[in-house]
Amino acid sequence: MELIFLGTSAGVPTRTRNVTAILLNLQHPTQSGLWLFDCGEGTQHQLLHTAFNPGKLDKIFISHLHGDHLFGLPGLLCSRSMSGIIQPLTIYGPQGIREFVETALRISGSWTDYPLEIVEIGAGEILDDGLRKVTAYPMEHPLECYGYRIEEHDKPGALNAQALKAAGVPPSPLFQELKAGKTIMLEDGRQINGADYLAAPVPGKALAIFGDTGPCDAALDLAKGVDVMVHEATLDITMEAKANSRGHSSTRQAATLAREAGVGKLIITHVSSRYDDKGCQHLLRECRSIFPATELANDFTVFNV
C-alpha cells in the first residue's frame, strides 16, 4: 500500500498546505484500488498534481463533517461525471453525509452519471472485500468523527514446488488447489495435502488513519500494532490544553500514543496554519523526542506502508 498526502493543513489552507485529504493506493496485483480519506476544499485540484485521476477512485471515507474535511466532495463528484467517468463510487461517512451530498447536488442542479452509493456508518467493521477489512473507531471531537483501521488479510505462504516435485507430484493446474491449502487425489491414489507444502502465511499490513481527535478511549485499539499510524499534531506541547479543548491533539499526545500502541511508524499531519516550515520542523522534533520513528507529512509526500 502507498499513502499520498493531498492536504495536510488544519482548518484552513496555507500557501504550501491544502486542507485534509489522503490517497491510499492499494497496489494489489489482481484487485487494485484507490481510496480517498477525507476531501477538503480543493482536493480535486490537488489530485491533478498526481499520477491519479478521479476515475480511479472507488471508495471515499469521510471522518467527520467539518468543512476542512468535506467541502471538496461535491466538486469532485460533479467533475467525475463531467469527465465521462462511469465507474461506481462508494462514500462512507458519519450520519449526515447522505443529506450533505444529496442537498449539494440538488440545489446546484447537479447529478452523477455513475452509480453512487452512500453508506452512513457507526463504530465497527464497515467493509471486508476479501483482501482487506476496514473498521471505524469513534474519535473525541465536537462532531461525530471516526478513525479508520485498514488491515490486509494474511497472504497464503508460497507453495514449495521443489518439495512437491521430489514427492512425485508433477506441475499441473492442481497446484492452484494445493496453494489454496486443499487436498488433491493423484492418479496413483495418493492424497496430497496442500497445507503440508505451504510456507507460513505472510502477515498483511495494517494502517490506522485517525480523524480529528483529542485523547480518547478508542485510540489504542485503533492504533495497536499497525505498521503505519497517521495522526494529527495540530498544536505543539505548550498549546496542548487549547488543542484538547477543541477536540484536537498535541505533538506529545500523538507521539505518546504511537509509542504505547507499538506502531511501526508515525506520520503527523493536520498541522495548524500558525506554523511555517520552521515551526513544522519544531513539531516533528517534539514528536521524535518521544517516538523517533516519526515523519512529517507535507502536501504530495508519498509513504509506503
From Swiss-Prot:
What are the names of the required cofactors? Zn(2+)
Pfam families under this entry?
Answer: Lactamase_B_2
Q: What is its EC number?
A: 3.1.-.-
Q: Where are the transmembrane segments?
A: none
Where along the chain is Zn(2+) 1 bound? 64, 66, 141, 212
Q: Which UniProt keywords apply?
A: Endonuclease, Exonuclease, Hydrolase, Metal-binding, Nuclease, tRNA processing, Zinc
Matching entries from InterPro entries are given as:
Metallo-B-lactamas, RibonucZ/Hydroxyglut_hydro, Rnase_BN, RNase_Z/BN
Q: Which Gene3D superfamilies match?
A: Ribonuclease Z/Hydroxyacylglutathione hydrolase-like
Q: Where does Zn(2+) 2 bind?
A: 68-69, 212, 270
Zinc recorded as keyword? yes
- Cross-referenced PANTHER family, in alphabetical order? ZINC PHOSPHODIESTERASE ELAC PROTEIN 1
Q: How does it assemble?
A: Homodimer.
Similarity field: Belongs to the RNase Z family. RNase BN subfamily.
The record's NCBIfam families line, in alphabetical order, gives:
PRK00055.1-1, PRK00055.1-3, RNase_Z, true_RNase_BN
**Task performed by this protein:** Zinc phosphodiesterase, which has both exoribonuclease and endoribonuclease activities.
Please identify the protein, giving its name as recorded.
Answer: Ribonuclease BN
The organism named in the record is Escherichia coli O157:H7
